[in-house]
Amino acid sequence: MAEVKLQEGESLENALRRFKRKVQQEDIIKEVKRHSFYLKPGEKKRVKEALARKRSRKKARKEQD
């Protein structure tokens, strides 16, 4: 869990900025969204395959240029 302690003389805005950066670096938001609802194994597989197709199409387009 991301934790930020206020340093002496530090403004709350700076501490909040450090906290947000730490949360992004640790991918906490992504994990929370991933665990917010249950996906059946078949649905997980379909999502994974769709992402793989999307990546391969993107890679093919990039190679054409």
Swiss-Prot record:
InterPro entries: Ribosomal_bS21 (IPR001911), Ribosomal_bS21_sf (IPR038380). It holds the Pfam family Ribosomal_S21. Residues 53-65 have a biased composition (Basic residues). One of its GO terms (cellular component) is ribosome. The keyword Transferase does not apply. Keywords: Ribonucleoprotein, Ribosomal protein. Residues 43-52 have a biased composition (Basic and acidic residues). One of its GO terms (biological process) is translation. The keyword Membrane does not apply. Residues 43-65 are annotated as: Disordered. GO terms for molecular function: structural constituent of ribosome. Belongs to the bacterial ribosomal protein bS21 family. This is Small ribosomal subunit protein bS21.
